[in-house]
Amino acid sequence: MTEKSICPSRDNGVVIPDNWTGYDLDVFSLPNHYCEDLECVFIPHGVIVDRTERIANDIMRDIGDNHITVLCVLKGGYRFCTDLVEHIKNLSRNSERFISMRVDFIRLKCYCNDQCMDELQILGGEDLAKLSGKNVLIVEDIINTGRTMTALLSQLEKYKPKMVKVASLLVKRSASSNQYRPDYTGFEIPNKFVVGYALDYNEYFRDLHHICVINEKGKNKYKV
């Protein structure tokens, strides 16, 4: 990734252009059983880690000195959430501003194969009532059309939290987007189906360290 091809922006995160082709698979360490199912390494693990640390800095700057309930969206968000929370804790230990955190979990189901379903399923939504009056940081893996997050925020608003911020590792540029933007974005990416770093395709590829683009062979192989 060169300086000319990647545009840093606080609002949009790191913007990866449509013509970015990623890295060849053979220059990274990948599980052999996945190599034929992937098109490229799109975002290397080290870049993800560095970007996550910067997001943690931004969160400390904006909402330090608060007690935060971190709402991790499972399953895809768990790795980003784990790393983000760890970075925030490390920053908090060495800062005059202290963030105390508790982590809770919710599951959203909106995909079958690589197609977004019309109806959002919120699993664990009955527990949202305990977020009333709390400062909430929602941690998500990817914003696709924005409809999923908009629906979750609408549901959460019924319980009147004190504050809600959203951090998403990825935001996808899509013609079907409702233009929702999270408060903190890791990377803005083209309209490609990506896997790895806990993002899955029918529960496969979560164990990849890098974010990769799945190819058509992989989609057909693991289709349900």
Curated annotation (Swiss-Prot):
Keyword Lipid biosynthesis: no
CDD domains: PRTases_typeI (cd06223)
InterPro entries xref list: HGPRT, Hxn_phspho_trans, PRibTrfase_dom, PRTase-like
Coiled-coil regions listed in the entry: none
Pfam family, one: Pribosyltran
Binding site for GMP: 140-148, 172, 193-194, 200
GO biological process, one term: purine ribonucleoside salvage
Domain of life: Eukaryota
Keyword Magnesium: yes
Residues binding Mg(2+): 140-141, 200
GO molecular function: hypoxanthine phosphoribosyltransferase activity; metal ion binding; nucleotide binding
NCBIfam families with a match to the protein in the record: HGPRTase (TIGR01203)
Family, as annotated: Belongs to the purine/pyrimidine phosphoribosyltransferase family.
Protein name: Phosphoribosyltransferase domain-containing protein 1
Organism, as annotated: Xenopus tropicalis
